[in-house]
Amino acid sequence: MGESALEPGPVPETPAGGPVHAVTVVTLLEKLATMLEALRERQGGLAERQGGLAGSVRRIQSGLGALSRSHDTTSNTLTQLLAKAERVGSHADAAQERAVRRAAQVQRLEANHGLLVARGKLHVLLFKEETEIPARAFQKVPELLGPEDQLVLGPDQPEDEVGESSEEEPVESRAQRLRRTGLQKVQSLKRALSSRKAAQPTPVKPPRVGPVRSSEGPSEGQPAAQPEMESELETALEPEPPQPTKEDPEKPVLQIESAA
């Protein structure tokens, strides 16, 4: 390109083979200088363009690096989210299994409760004493019994059977238990009545001049009425013999005795 611009062309003014004038040489040098200046300007513009392209390329490379880093961060976040989702799924499956098991247990409990309610074969027998009885009275009956207590026992139960401990006879019948509680009630009432009699002081009455039949009448009838009251209490507290009942072998019977 430079060589073609520097090639001198034919000068029409000068004849071929004639002498070259100085003016022609000067004009040719001026043209050459202007061409060189234009070439330098073009080279500077090309260098500036090349620098701009290099800057844009560097900016593009930095953008690509940031994009790759953000892509790596996003991939790591997605991996963590997937792991958390798997853990949550496993926990949800375990919770669902537990809920199913609990629902089955609740259904079984409801069925058992309905069956128990439908049967209604649970009976609770409560024995409550009016006076406090020691716990040893349930294990062994006192050996010394009065004649009245022996009459209440009757011929069905000998004294040897009453004196046996609970260790020798762990299983007691219902009739024996009722009879024993009745005897304990009678004994407690007798002790209460005897203590009440001993605590009451005999009032001292002043002597009267008139007839004493009206005043002595109630005092003579009072000790006669006292044994009658004791006999009535004994007959009322005497346990009735148990009647034979047909018990269902499948029916559970719960007996609770309270000494309070």
UniProtKB/Swiss-Prot annotation:
GO MF term (any one): protein kinase C binding
Localisation per UniProt entry: Cytoplasm; Cytoplasm, Cytosol; Membrane, Caveola
Chain residue numbers at which the record places covalent cross-link Glycyl lysine isopeptide (Lys-Gly) (interchain with G-Cter in SUMO2): K128
One Gene Ontology CC term in the entry: cytoplasm
Region entry Leucine-zipper, spans: 20-78
Positions of region (Interaction with CAV1): 135-200
Null mutant phenotype: Mice show reduced density of membrane caveolae in the arterial smooth muscle and the urinary bladder but show no loss of endothelial caveolae in lung and heart.
Signal peptide: none
Chain positions covered by the region annotation Disordered: 146-260
Post-translational modification: In vitro, phosphorylated by PRKCD.
Domain description: The leucine-zipper domain is essential for its localization in the caveolae and for its interaction with CAV1 and EPS15L1.
Protein name: Caveolae-associated protein 3
Species for this entry: Mus musculus (Mouse)
